[in-house]
Amino acid sequence: ADIVFPIHPRTAKIFANFGISADNLHIVEPLGYLDFNYLVKYAKAVITDSGGITEETTVMGVPCLTLRDNTERPETCDIGTNELIGTNPDNIKPALDKLFAGEWKKGTIPPLWDGKSADRIVDILVNL
């Protein structure tokens, strides 16, 4: 499987210094929000240490492996496509094996993530 890794230039230098490369590893410069979300939409999965992207993966139905022990967005784990796999690198392969075997959970979009927040806010303000 191809791996696309949007990476900060400083981190890219570290990769180069250590000689980290692989034929299926495509290191690209950081992407803008829309380009990044396009990449996420067509990804088999996302591996991240960020809390924010877990919202996008949940909405898009893309499996997300989060390299953390906790999250500020527990709903992405509870009903979304996100799973906390911890900070031990040895946890990545078993999680990917589960994913590629078709055993990853099928998440749903949280009820209030329906794109109607502004309508609800206006209704509340109008009725004050």
Label every PLM stretch briefly.
Residues 5-128:
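Nucleotide-activated sugar donor-binding and catalytic core shared by glycosyltransferases
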